[in-house]
Curated annotation (Swiss-Prot):
Involved in the binding of tRNA to the ribosomes. GO terms for biological process: translation. This is Small ribosomal subunit protein uS10. The keyword NAD does not apply. The lineage of its organism: Bacteria, Bacillati, Cyanobacteriota, Cyanophyceae, Oscillatoriophycideae.
């Protein structure tokens, strides 16, 4: 019995700026919908919060510290039944430099 394997592209996006990430997701979903592919998402994943603790004084005061944090926002978009037009359109898509994109076929 042969199973019907469905083609799928999974796109994982990461960024420090949430607004940049959301506009990139909108562009990807619009591009997929224009080429008659089915786009599911963007699905928000948990935000990673990284806190750095730094001494304020270069010399002795260990009691005085400062905290900095970075937040990494993540999204997943699944594109089902992509055609060659879909892949070409996604490759030509101009996205901001602050967004990390990972594509799995």
């Amino acid at each position: 019995m042969a199973t019907l394997q469905q083609q799928k592209i999974r796109i994982r996006l990461k960024a420090f700026d949430r607004r940049l990430l959301d506009t990139s997701c909108e562009k990807i979903v619009d591009t997929a919908n224009r080429t008659n592919a089915t786009a599911i998402g963007p699905i928000p994943l948990p935000t990673k919060r990284r806190v750095y603790c730094v001494l304020r004084s270069p010399h002795v005061d260990k009691d005085s510290r400062e905290h900095f944090e970075t937040r990494t926002h993540r999204r997943i978009i699944d594109i089902y039944q992509p055609s060659s037009k879909t892949i070409d359109a996604l490759m030509k898509l101009d996205l901001p430099a602050g967004v990390d994109i990972e594509v799995k076929l």
